């Protein structure tokens, strides 16, 4: 009994530390807190790892750059592609849960964050006709002395740079993201994430590489309830 209690305490403590801390990037807070005046990334306004003034860079379309990283080296992103790129940027900069997937060798980075297949496919569809000159947006740029990014190669369409949504999700941000085998225990960068994160945070480190069938069933059940509730709310507003 004592061993169980000690083990349970250790699991809860570890989960709590990850849940209520932020990544250690230049723009990250030490701990998440409310940011009611966010202009973008409002999904995380109740508990944010970024300050509201950071989101000013994302508030106006087209987005030119974030800090010293230019988004328009191959022309302005289409609005649909930009919207998905913002979702990823917002998660990394502002999500209070990103630190759950903190990179073991780089505390400002993330590793193997599970994205839903549908999200990756939609992201690819939104960006396939846009152009890029790097495959890995974290590592493949040429950086000048001022820390500004430049292309090393010619610009080509996303549809040529990446084979499909899976390839794009698992390549563009290096090893930051992976496509989940589950359609529920994964992130879509919307309000449904709060439900999925509840189950993802409860997974032990030993189970992190595989999907727990009991958690999958519980998540799917919650997802159905969530979607039914949203449909009912939509009907009431018509």
UniProtKB/Swiss-Prot annotation:
Keywords: Disulfide bond, Glycoprotein, Phosphoprotein, Signal, Transport. Expressed in egg yolk and egg white (at protein level). InterPro entries: Folate_rcpt, Folate_rcpt-like. The modification Phosphoserine is found at residues 204-205, 208-210, 212-214. One of its GO terms (biological process) is riboflavin transport. N-glycosylated. Residues 1-17 form the signal peptide. On the 2D-gel the determined MW is: 47 kDa. Belongs to the folate receptor family. This is Riboflavin-binding protein. It comes from Dromaius novaehollandiae.
